[in-house]
């Protein structure tokens, strides 16, 4: 039968005319990709998949409980006949509703909106409703059975955290107007959780690809004789199913062992051949054949493999020595049951009972069917397939041992997956649900059967016992544990006093600006922190940019310092994370394809002798084919048609081992790429005709030749349609113009870096591209904010990705309806004169400042910046800073109000209570230090004195900086407790010491606010807003900022905004002509006057507009720590650190430069010495040992020299003295040498 072929044909590539397509037009393809999926759409889709498929699948399929226990009840004669009771129950329906909360004033439940949860400190969670079927069976000694059944109607068990913006959220599919009406940001994408009033993000987590063999060399350690290991995690399905791991080890003794990691199997290294014998393959030759495939082959590789395998069979294993050469599989299974089984406490006690032995053996095989390679099947009829697959795994490990193939690249995204919030929460839910729901139900039934005779049980008894087990405490356990897994971030959480490993990685959502919010939602974390924290080569490799990153992981954005360097990454701008696809339909299509022979129809010898390629789907070996390349190409064309294969299916041909892999599992990174078509078939035919004509002596044989052409079908008109909104990415996929590629399949592609490279090799038949890329796609959103990033040192771009997330701006549009702690709202934000594609998706967070690059006095050394006072007065970088004060009424004896001094005691001395109205300072009131902002009193119980009825518990404002009361609220908490919530507003103008940054990562600190009259100016009267040290650029190589200033100068004079996205071409000649048209020099430098003397500067000054951002590091917040006194460490006497301990402020490098610029060197000495731990130390000049000085009685004494001592005073530090004491305690003496006395004549 002829295989099915694709039906759609595309027009000749020679007719495609896209010569007008520019690199700027190619940016529209990025816009199409972002508009299609959204910047965080994958996160919402992952959670929706959990709600619609994951939770129902987990509850219904994985928690079908079937346990039998010995009956303990013996009250009656019937009870004594009852030997055991079997408890069976399964959940028949699972439903998760939208968030609700109880309205205590009305006594009913109402919808819980996200902003209500934020203000009231609630968790945005939806009710979880379950329905179940219960079967209780009593087994009597006379063989009789009695069955009781009950159907549990749906009822609420607990609540589950709901993601903002998901299909279970009240804002789902709401219009922008409707979102405004409920106090939500109309442009906010969602993708986060609200737990106990705070906003949290579940990070994307790197994980290894399941159903894939990962082979690694093992470091030789003491007591470990392992050379190499292969790890294989088998998971049926592709998303939420349970997995099982096996570890295959090759030891220095030549032994090959297999360890099965499962909760039903004790960890034990079993000789590999025993697994084959247990499944019915007893002959050594047939076992070895499963690994080498062809015993008759005389190839060196085959011969060496057979030698290794034969040696491994004869290596003595002390544990399995009794069955090492045992051919009887029943005895092997029985021996294994005694060693590794967990389902019976003492298997050896059953040896005398043949029926019991047979039962144990069958039970053991049934467990092995479920936990050994379950993705290949979980029934007895799949055992042969499993053995063949296990032989293939050992075969690949032996090839690595012989250095035929390299070990697995641990850092390549070809063998990795990125799991979103849905998969992470599913892992936590499995463990928590088992502990907080399943265990109480089982215990509840056991208690019921202990108290009530089985024959007296009714359906009502069973339903009541089931419901009582899932009481309020159980509901709170499940809900509280899920919240804890999101909030705590701990590796271990406690559920019913039982530790459970938390596999959810989260971070608090700090809304500094919209870029910060989106970056937090696109963070990818590597959770292997054990190896990363070590100073090893492996730790260094984990942090490097891998060759598989471009297009999927941003190559520029990561932490710039600390342990998170290279461990916390960002998705590239067009990257997306796939959910699990429909495997069954594709599997059936592949098995029905005549080009594929099913695995059962192919022998191992045929695979080698006929050169067959293996075919896998989600890691399951389903068959073989004769032409792997043709099969992969044919199904890629099916995918391009969009009929048989889903567009997000991964089709990968591994030419090294000749395998075709189809992947539809969850967590695959994918990105769209434009397809490149060519006329290779016509070209080959023309070359063949030309060669034939030449053979025949035709002198005009060259006329038969045609040029080779390769091109993309994407045109400039399509780019315009995308920008106009009439063409989407889905349309491009449906038309076969682009397709989705994963890191695996990228290895089968030859991708042109840009449209320019494609055109350069348009007729080069030796470089046939499969796709063309957009250069900007290798960067993430934060990196694309930097203009001309490809001209800037990469480290500076990395700094900008972190600084851009700390800048002040508009953190959300719903700020009037929110009460946030430590949030800065910048008044004026401008669109940059040189914008980038990132500004299409995030609000700009800065100003176009006029910057002069020059030295002007001594106040802009290093990173110091001189700021124009008029720029500050005009509101440059000005904004509002918000704090919150939250007070709870802890009991019914407390109330809000203005304390009456006649009947209230413990009033705060010196406090001002006059501004209180009904317990709160009114909105718009200015409060200062010492003002009471929230009045609260508590009634003294049992107090008979009429003058002391109440005690004051008011909140006093304790900051030196005045504030304005911006909002006052009285929300109710989850248990109807009343809160007092106040939002305070502070003015945050630019101050000396505040930090700024350009978009090229060049950070500066305001060192001087210079009056307008002293600022330099150009011939046109233009004065700079900032004066920046030009020496900060050559060493940092921030060429992108220089280009931005030059282009911005031309744009400002001509009144246009241009695109400065990275990798766009820069025409220096055209830029110089634009400047010349405006009467400037070709390089943008201008003649300037000294504002203080009025004289010309000798050199031309480079001046122009540069986009600057203000970082949220405010000097006013740190002034509390600037003093000559404060708490100190008891041992060293040094000031404490941090606001919590009221400690001092760290004097950093940039602060040091500011003080140096101000000529305050003595201040530095004073703060780092006198105000720290400076002290006087007394030392004997004769022996160099410490001396003793009594301050109350001026007595100097040396323990060594006594009266001959010559003691001198030395300016020292307490930390130095403590160090010397520690060294002497370690028996290491330290002596000091003092300069001799110098006597001056009178």
Swiss-Prot record:
Gene Ontology biological-process annotations: DNA-templated transcription; DNA-templated viral transcription
Main location per the UniProt record: host cell
Subcellular compartments: Host cytoplasm; Virion
Catalytic activity, as annotated: RNA(n) + a ribonucleoside 5'-triphosphate = RNA(n+1) + diphosphate
Induction: Expressed in the late phase of the viral replicative cycle.
Alphabetical keyword list: DNA-directed RNA polymerase, Host cytoplasm, Late protein, Metal-binding, Nucleotidyltransferase, Transcription, Transferase, Viral transcription, Virion, Zinc, Zinc-finger
UniProt EC number: 2.7.7.6
Annotated GO CC locations: DNA-directed RNA polymerase complex; host cell cytoplasm; virion component
SUPFAM superfamilies in UniProt: beta and beta-prime subunits of DNA dependent RNA-polymerase (SSF64484)
GO MF terms held by the record: DNA binding; DNA-directed RNA polymerase activity; ribonucleoside binding; zinc ion binding
Start-end of C4-type zinc fingers: 1180-1201
Family: Belongs to the RNA polymerase beta chain family.
Note: The binding of ribonucleoside triphosphate to the RNA polymerase transcribing complex probably involves a two-step mechanism. The initial binding seems to occur at the entry (E) site and involves a magnesium ion coordinated by three conserved aspartate residues of the two largest RNA Pol subunits.
Function description: Catalytic component of the DNA-directed RNA polymerase (RNAP) that catalyzes the transcription in the cytoplasm of viral DNA into RNA using the four ribonucleoside triphosphates as substrates. Forms the polymerase active center together with RPB1. Part of the core element with the central large cleft, the clamp element that moves to open and close the cleft and the jaws that are thought to grab the incoming DNA template.
Quaternary state and interactors: Part of the viral DNA-directed RNA polymerase that consists of 8 polII-like subunits (RPB1, RPB2, RPB3, RPB5, RPB6, RPB7, RPB9, RPB10), a capping enzyme and a termination factor.
Protein name, per record: DNA-directed RNA polymerase RPB2 homolog
Organism, as annotated: African swine fever virus (strain Badajoz 1971 Vero-adapted)
């Amino acid at each position: 039968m002829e295989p099915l072929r694709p039906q759609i044909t595309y027009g000749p590539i020679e007719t495609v005319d896209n010569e007008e397509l520019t690199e700027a037009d190619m940016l529209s393809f990025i816009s199409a990709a972002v508009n299609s999926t959204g910047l965080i759409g994958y996160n919402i889709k992952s959670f929706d998949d959990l709600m619609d498929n994951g939770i129902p699948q987990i509850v219904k399929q994985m928690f079908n409980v079937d346990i039998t226990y010995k009956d303990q009840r013996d009250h009656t004669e019937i009870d004594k006949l009852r030997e055991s009771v079997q408890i069976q129950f399964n959940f028949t329906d699972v439903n998760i509703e939208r968030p609700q909360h109880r309205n205590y004033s009305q006594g009913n439940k109402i919808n819980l909106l996200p902003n209500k949860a934020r203000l009231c400190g609630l968790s945005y969670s939806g009710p979880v409703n379950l329905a179940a079927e219960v079967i209780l069976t009593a087994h009597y000694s006379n063989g009789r059975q009695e069955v009781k059944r009950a159907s549990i109607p749906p009822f609420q068990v607990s609540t589950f955290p709901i993601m903002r913006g998901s299909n279970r959220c009240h804002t789902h599919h709401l219009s922008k107007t409707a979102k405004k009406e409920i106090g939500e940001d109309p442009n906010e994408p969602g993708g986060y959780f609200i737990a106990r009033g705070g906003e949290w993000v579940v990070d994307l987590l790197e994980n290894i690809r399941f159903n894939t063999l990962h082979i690694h060399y093992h470091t030789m350690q003491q007591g470990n004789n392992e050379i190499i290991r292969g790890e294989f995690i088998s998971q049926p399905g592709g998303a939420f199913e349970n997995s099982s791991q096996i570890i295959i080890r090759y030891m220095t003794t030549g032994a090959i062992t297999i360890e099965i990691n499962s909760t039903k199997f004790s960890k034990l290294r079993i000789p590999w051949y025993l697994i084959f014998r247990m499944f019915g393959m007893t002959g050594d030759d047939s076992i070895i054949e499963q690994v080498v495939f062809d015993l008759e082959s005389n190839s060196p590789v085959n011969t060496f493999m057979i030698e290794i395998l034969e040696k491994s069979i004869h290596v003595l294993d002390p544990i399995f020595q009794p069955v090492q050469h045992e051919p009887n599989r029943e005895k092997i299974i029985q021996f294994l049951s005694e060693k590794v089984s967990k389902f019976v406490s003492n298997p050896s006690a059953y040896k005398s009972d043949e029926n019991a032995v047979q039962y144990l053996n069958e039970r053991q095989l049934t467990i092995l069917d479920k936990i050994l390679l379950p993705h290949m099947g979980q029934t007895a009829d799949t055992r042969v397939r499993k053995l063949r697959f296990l032989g293939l795994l050992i075969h690949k490990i032996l090839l690595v041992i012989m250095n035929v193939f390299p070990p697995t690249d641990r850092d390549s995204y070809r063998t990795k997956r990125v799991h979103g919030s849905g998969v992470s929460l599913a892992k936590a839910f499995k463990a928590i649900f088992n502990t907080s729901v399943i265990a109480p139900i089982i215990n509840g039934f056991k208690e019921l059967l202990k108290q009530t005779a089985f024959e007296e049980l009714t359906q009502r008894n069973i339903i009541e016992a089931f419901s009582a087990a899932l009481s309020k405490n159980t509901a709170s356990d499940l809900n509280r544990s899920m919240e804890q897994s999101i909030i705590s971030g701990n590796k271990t959480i406690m559920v019913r006093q039982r530790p459970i490993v938390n596999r959810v990685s989260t971070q608090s959502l700090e809304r500094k600006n919209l870029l910060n919010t989106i970056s937090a939602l696109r963070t990818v974390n590597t959770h292997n922190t054990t190896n990363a924290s070590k100073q090893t080569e492996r730790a260094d490799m984990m942090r490097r940019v891998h060759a598989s990153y471009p297009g999927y992981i941003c190559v520029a954005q990561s932490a710039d310092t600390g342990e998170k360097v290279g461990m916390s990454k960002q998705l590239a701008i067009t990257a997306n994370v796939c959910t699990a696809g429909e495997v069954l339909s594709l599997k059936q299509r592949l098995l029905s394809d005549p080009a594929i022979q099913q695995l059962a129809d192919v022998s191992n010898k045929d695979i080698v002798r006929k050169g067959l390629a293996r075919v896998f789907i989600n890691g399951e070996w389903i068959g073989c084919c004769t032409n792997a390349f043709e099969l992969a190409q044919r199904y890629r064309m099916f995918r391009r048609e969009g009929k048989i294969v889903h567009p997000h299916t991964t089709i990968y041909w591994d030419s090294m081992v000749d395998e075709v892999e189809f992947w539809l599992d969850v967590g695959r990174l994918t990105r769209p790429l434009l397809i490149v078509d060519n006329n290779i078939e016509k070209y080959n035919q023309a070359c063949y005709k030309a060669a034939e004509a030449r053979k025949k002596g035709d002198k005009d044989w060259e006329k038969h030749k045609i040029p080779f052409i390769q091109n993309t079908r994407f045109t400039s008109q399509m780019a315009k349609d995308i920008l106009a909104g009439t063409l989407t990415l889905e349309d491009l996929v449906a038309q076969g113009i682009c397709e989705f590629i994963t890191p695996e399949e990228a290895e089968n592609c030859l991708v042109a870096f840009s449209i320019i490279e494609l055109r350069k090799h348009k007729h080069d038949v030796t470089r046939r591209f499969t796709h063309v890329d957009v250069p900007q796609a290798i960067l993430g959103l934060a990196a694309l904010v930097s203009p001309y990033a490809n001209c800037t040192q990469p480290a500076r771009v990395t700094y900008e990705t972190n600084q851009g997330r700390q800048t002040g701006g508009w953190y959300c549009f719903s700020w009037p309806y929110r009460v946030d702690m430590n949030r800065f709202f910048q008044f004026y934000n401008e669109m940059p004169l040189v914008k980038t594609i990132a500004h299409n998706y995030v609000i700009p967070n800065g100003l176009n400042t006029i910057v002069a690059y020059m030295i002007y006095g001594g106040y802009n050394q290093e990173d110091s910046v001189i700021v124009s006072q008029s720029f500050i007065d005009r509101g440059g970088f000005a904004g509002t800073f918000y704090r919150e004060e939250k007070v709870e009424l802890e009991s019914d004896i407390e109330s809000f109000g203005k304390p009456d001094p006649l009947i209230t005691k413990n009033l705060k001395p010196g406090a001002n209570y006059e501004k209180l109205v009904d317990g709160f300072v009114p909105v718009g009131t200015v409060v200062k230090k010492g003002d009471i902002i929230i009045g609260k009193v508590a009634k003294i119980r049992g107090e008979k004195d009429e003058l002391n009825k109440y005690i004051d518990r008011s909140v006093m404002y304790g900051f030196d900086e005045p504030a304005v009361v911006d909002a006052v609220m009285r929300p109710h908490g989850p248990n109807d407790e009343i809160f007092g919530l106040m939002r305070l507003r502070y003015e945050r103008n630019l101050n000396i010491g505040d930090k700024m940054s350009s978009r090229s990562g060049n950070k500066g600190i305001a060192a001087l606010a210079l009056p307008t009259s002293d600022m330099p100016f150009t011939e046109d009267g233009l004065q700079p807003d900032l004066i920046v040290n030009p020496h900060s650029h050559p060493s940092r190589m921030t060429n992108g900022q220089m280009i931005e200033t030059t282009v911005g100068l031309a744009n400002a004079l001509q009144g246009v905004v241009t695109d400065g996205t990275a990798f766009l071409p820069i025409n220096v000649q055209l830029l110089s002509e634009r400047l010349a048209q405006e009467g400037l020099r070709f390089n943008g430098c201008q003649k300037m006057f000294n504002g203080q003397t009025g004289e010309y500067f000798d050199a031309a000054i480079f001046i122009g507009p540069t986009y600057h951002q203000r970082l949220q590091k405010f000097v006013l917040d740190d002034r509390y720590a600037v003093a000559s006194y404060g708490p100190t460490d008891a041992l060293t006497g040094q000031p404490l650190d941090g606001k919590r301990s009221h400690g001092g402020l760290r004097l950093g490098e940039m602060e040091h430069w500011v003080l140096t610029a101000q000529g305050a060197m003595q201040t530095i000495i004073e703060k780092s010495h006198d105000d720290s731990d400076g002290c006087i130390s007394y030392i004997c000049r004769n022996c160099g040992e410490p001396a003793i000085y009594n301050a109350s009685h001026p007595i100097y004494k040396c323990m060594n020299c006594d009266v001959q001592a010559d003691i001198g005073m030395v300016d020292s530090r307490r930390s130095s003295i403590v160090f010397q004491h520690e060294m002497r305690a370690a028996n290491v003496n330290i002596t000091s040498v003092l300069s001799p006395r110098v006597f001056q004549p009178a």
